[in-house]
Amino acid sequence: MIDRLMAREAIYQQSNPDPGGDPPEDGPPHGKNAADGGDEPDRGPDPDVTLRPQRMAEMVGQQDVIERLRIAIDAAQVRGEPLGHILFDGPPGLGKTTFATVIPSEMKTTVQMANGAGLKAPRDLLPYLTNVSRGSVLFIDEIHRVPRAIEEYLYTAMEDFRIDIVLGEGVNARTLNLSLEPFTLIGATTRAGMLTAPLRDRFQIREHLGWYTRKELAEIVLRNSKKLNIEVDPTSAGVIADRSRSTPRLANNRLLWVRDYAQSKTKGNVEASVCEAALDMIGIDHLGLDKQDRNYLDTLMRVFLGGPAGLDAIAHTMNVSSDTLEDEVEPFLLRSELLVRTRRGRLATPKAFEHMKRQMPDRPLS
């Protein structure tokens, strides 16, 4: 215990040059992020948490990933060892956090949850590491945002279950070796390419989460409608699934809005026409495009005659940042084959013109 307190104090002093500052309190971090500074007031259950599966048996989709994880979990339990470190990557909303919460349930252990953006210095990481128990899980979301200084502590923590703390400076410096209980680190990222190779290679299990099928999304909608105590028929579930961009999180968001709309407009009656009217009201069309998606395509077709046009030119015309378009708008348009990128710029496809009910220009689009 004394070594842990000395280590925490040493890391704090290295990270905080202000000698008058107070060291972090002993004990586990509160909430999901140590940077939060304390518990937030109770605002009632988070709908996303309420709808999230609690065990793997409740999960829909990603069955190949689930099967591989079941094998790894079973083998670890047979050996009586912690599960190997796991890295999940993929677009937002596909279940990375869900996996990070159900795996501890399957292993019958505890989980600490952190966010890479909140781990700004080694002193932010230390409370998590010193509070791991044997076989427990530490989940770091957005792990690609962890600074290099944090990574260096994770290397030995993941590989040797220890961290080395340098006490003092110069000729008086000495190293304190702090042993950790064997634990499982689960990382989640939407940008696996931003991870350094040394960190990426320390994950024994790496899984990429893919898009969900219409059938899988409809099943998710039907299951979660029961949790919300509303009746949704398969046809209505299909309408919601069609407009959810192959993403469970969006399907849940659409379902919550349809519930609110139905309770306000139709006394809770949910049918296909009600789902369509509810989603039309918030600008979600039958392909899942929202207002900004259609505004992008409209600008590309109306101003630039379908392209090719540069991203910056489109962004300036729409009065939207190019980062917003590149990160939030274009990925779905590209995946839906409504947009292509060429060396000369962005180009609307024939499918996009058909969807927007616009006539393609006579000149070849190249």
From Swiss-Prot:
Transmembrane segment boundaries: none
SMART domains found in the cross-reference section: AAA
Name of the protein described by the UniProt record: Holliday junction branch migration complex subunit RuvB
Domain observations: Has 3 domains, the large (RuvB-L) and small ATPase (RuvB-S) domains and the C-terminal head (RuvB-H) domain. The head domain binds DNA, while the ATPase domains jointly bind ATP, ADP or are empty depending on the state of the subunit in the translocation cycle. During a single DNA translocation step the structure of each domain remains the same, but their relative positions change.
Keyword Nucleotide-binding belongs to the record: yes
Coiled coil feature spans: none
Family: Belongs to the RuvB family.
Species of origin: Rhodopirellula baltica (strain DSM 10527 / NCIMB 13988 / SH1)
Principal location listed in the UniProt entry: cytoplasm
Residue numbers spanned by region Head domain (RuvB-H): 286-366
Binding-site residues, Mg(2+): 97
Any one Gene Ontology BP term: DNA repair
GO terms under cellular component: cytoplasm; Holliday junction resolvase complex
Subunit details: Homohexamer. Forms an RuvA(8)-RuvB(12)-Holliday junction (HJ) complex. HJ DNA is sandwiched between 2 RuvA tetramers; dsDNA enters through RuvA and exits via RuvB. An RuvB hexamer assembles on each DNA strand where it exits the tetramer. Each RuvB hexamer is contacted by two RuvA subunits (via domain III) on 2 adjacent RuvB subunits; this complex drives branch migration. In the full resolvosome a probable DNA-RuvA(4)-RuvB(12)-RuvC(2) complex forms which resolves the HJ.
One example GO MF annotation: ATP binding
Pfam families recorded: AAA_lid_4 (PF17864), RuvB_C (PF05491), RuvB_N (PF05496)
Keywords: ATP-binding, Cytoplasm, DNA damage, DNA recombination, DNA repair, DNA-binding, Hydrolase, Nucleotide-binding
Binding-site residues, DNA: 341, 343, 346
EC number from the UniProt entry: 3.6.4.-
Region of interest: Large ATPase domain (RuvB-L): 21-212
Annotated stretches, region: Small ATPAse domain (RuvB-S): 213-283
CDD domains per UniProt: AAA (cd00009)
Family annotation (InterPro entries): AAA+_ATPase, AAA_lid_4, DNA_helicase_Holl-junc_RuvB, P-loop_NTPase, RuvB-like_N, RuvB_C, WH-like_DNA-bd_sf, WH_DNA-bd_sf
RNA-binding as UniProt keyword: no
Compartments where located: Cytoplasm
PANTHER family (alphabetical): HOLLIDAY JUNCTION BRANCH MIGRATION COMPLEX SUBUNIT RUVB (PTHR42848:SF1), PTHR42848
